[in-house]
Design a protein with these regions (language model features):
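Phosphate/pyrophosphate-binding loops and the adjoining catalytic core of nucleotide-dependent enzymes
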Residues: 1-193
Length: 193
């Protein structure tokens, strides 16, 4: 047991955190009625004894009105007693983007934890802009793509997704371009990371 971080057992209990995160992610009772966290998985833990514990959670969230569900990743850091509020206040001064689900920044005082909703991140300040660019393939000029495959090709479709995310450390996105050369009825896929 870490006397500086007595909340460790709770923040590593996915069922307890599913309920705690549900209350913290959605501000209003109507939003909590509309969205349910169906599953909470821990995808990463980094622990510094007597100092802090970083935990990343993957949530499966369902909109009960539409039946649609989606994934939201939260990366949080638990602090010794009394240290989460100053960290939350400091993080609140940064420009944050609205995530797909819930609030961009969450403070859970009952477990002395501050969480950032992906694509917001405590250390990677440019991640929101970078992940938006990866998902919005219109930011990659077709001429750039075509310069790499030669003349006569056309971009017919693009798909992007985040392939790997390690909170406070790295994020890798993949973009695939579907290409066609109509003169030879040839297709090709170009993938970049």
């Amino acid at each position: 047991m870490d006397v500086q971080l007595p909340q460790l057992s709770m923040i590593l209990d996915t069922e307890a955190m599913r309920k705690t995160l549900w209350n913290g992610m959605f501000e209003s009772a109507s939003a909590r009625d509309r969205f349910l966290i169906r599953q909470c998985d821990i995808i990463q833990v980094r622990y510094k004894p007597a100092s802090s514990c970083m935990v990343s959670y993957r949530l499966n969230v369902e909109n009960v009105e539409t039946g649609e569900s989606g994934e939201q990743i939260l990366c949080g850091r638990a602090f010794p007693e009394g240290r989460s509020l100053p960290q939350w206040e400091k993080a609140s001064t940064r420009a944050l983007v609205q995530p797909r689900l819930g609030k961009p920044l969450i403070h859970l005082p009952e477990v002395e934890m501050v969480l950032w909703s992906f694509p917001n991140d405590r250390k990677m300040h440019t991640l929101p802009a970078s992940s938006h660019a990866a998902c919005s393939t219109s930011s990659i000029p077709p001429n750039w793509v075509l310069a790499h495959v030669g003349t006569g090709w056309q971009v017919t479709d693009t798909k992007s997704c985040v392939m790997h995310y390690v909170g406070e450390h790295t994020c890798t996105a993949q973009t695939s371009f579907e290409l066609i050369r109509s003169s030879q009825d040839t297709r090709q896929t170009l993938t970049i990371f």
